[in-house]
Structure formats: structure tokens, C-alpha cells
């Protein structure tokens, strides 16, 4: 908006400025949120400034609410976890495998300020591994991602029996669901959030 006004004040044709901005506008990669299947997708009763996606009648939040494994429910779980988990909300952040071409690996660690019933300050770690490509990602064994992370101080053996907190590719994995263990392979576009307490 600022660039547009600056160019018009400088004497440029408004239509030409808009034409020049169109290929680089962030609006090319987004549409209004589709809340429901109504004519304006529940986004507005007026006219949105950019067009709705053609599938807004079938792909929307209301169609995914309550459906295990849906993007809506996965985000709902992530938001709840952010509110309920001290390591996620308050813990230190460490990016691992920063040069990996397809994986995001994040370690969060939090130490409770108050001793527990044993007199120790509880330490909780969360490890997120997300495969951001369609190919499978090998995690364990020789040549697996965790073996490569040993150089960054991550001990793979500590995570083999960790609790699986959330798994994008498996809606049955939820906090407290009892799923444990590091998967050997993450499928394309899958992620796993693991928790261990020390």
C-alpha cells in the first residue's frame, strides 16, 4: 500500500503500479479463510478484496471440525498444547539440522522453577521432527537423521522410548494417548512431537 501511494504521488499511472505489484503480492498465495460452505465462506457478508478459492463450498473449517486427522483438528491440538505444556510455552528453543534440505528439527527444553516431590527440579524436553517434502525421511539406524544429530549433541538413544505427543500422520497420537517410541521413518509431510522428562 505504501509503495503504491509513493509511486502514484511520484506521477506513475495507478493501473501500471498495480500491474507491476501483482506478480510479487502476497495475496497471490492466499485466500480469505473458508469458515463454512456458504456463498462467502463465512468470511464476510460483503465483498472480499480477493477471490475465494473455487473449492470453498467443500473445503472449509466447518467440514473439518471434529474430524480426526483433519488439518483443523491438528491445529486445535497444537494450540491446546501451546497453552498446556510448559516446555513448549516457556522452554528454550534450539534449531537442529539447520542445513537439512527437507527436515525441520526443533528441541525445546524447560526446567521447572520449583522442586517436585523428590526435591528435584523437573526437566522436560520436546523434540519436533517435521518432514517438509513428499519423500520418506529415515530417522533411526545408520544414516538416519538422528545419527547425524549426534554431532549436535542429541543422543538418539534418549528418544527411542519417548512419548509421542502429536503426530500429523496419525490422528490417534494425542497427549496422554500412550503412544511411545521414535518412528523409524516419517512419511512425506508427516511430523512427530516427542516428549521426554529427566
Question: Can you say where each PLM-predicted feature lies in the sequence?
Answer:
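C-terminal beta-sandwich/jelly-roll accessory domains of carbohydrate-active enzymes
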Residues: 133-198
Amino acid at each position: 500500500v505504501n509503495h503504491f501511494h509513493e509511486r502514484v504521488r511520484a506521477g506513475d499511472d495507478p493501473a501500471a503500479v498495480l500491474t507491476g505489484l501483482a506478480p510479487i503480492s502476497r495475496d497471490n498465495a492466499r485466500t480469505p479463510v473458508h469458515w463454512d460452505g456458504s456463498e462467502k465462506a463465512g468470511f464476510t457478508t460483503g465483498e472480499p478484496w480477493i477471490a475465494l478459492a473455487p473449492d470453498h463450498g467443500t473445503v472449509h473449517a466447518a467440514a473439518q471440525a471434529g474430524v480426526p486427522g483433519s488439518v483443523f483438528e491438528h491445529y486445535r491440538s497444537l494450540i491446546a498444547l501451546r497453552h498446556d505444556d510448559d516446555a513448549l510455552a516457556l522452554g528454550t528453543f534450539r534449531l537442529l539440522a539447520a542445513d537439512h534440505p527437507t527436515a525441520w528439527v526443533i528441541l525445546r527444553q524447560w526446567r521447572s522453577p520449583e522442586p517436585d516431590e523428590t526435591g528435584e527440579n523437573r526437566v522436560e524436553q520436546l523434540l519436533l521432527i517435521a518432514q517438509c517434502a513428499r519423500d520418506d525421511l529415515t530417522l533411526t539406524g545408520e544414516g538416519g537423521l538422528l545419527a547425524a544429530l549426534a554431532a549436535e549433541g542429541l543422543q538418539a538413544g534418549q528418544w527411542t522410548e519417548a512419548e509421542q505427543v502429536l503426530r500429523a500422520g496419525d490422528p490417534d497420537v494425542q497427549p496422554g494417548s500412550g503412544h511411545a517410541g521414535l518412528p523409524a521413518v516419517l512419511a512425506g509431510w508427516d511430523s512427530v512431537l516427542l516428549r521426554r522428562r529427566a
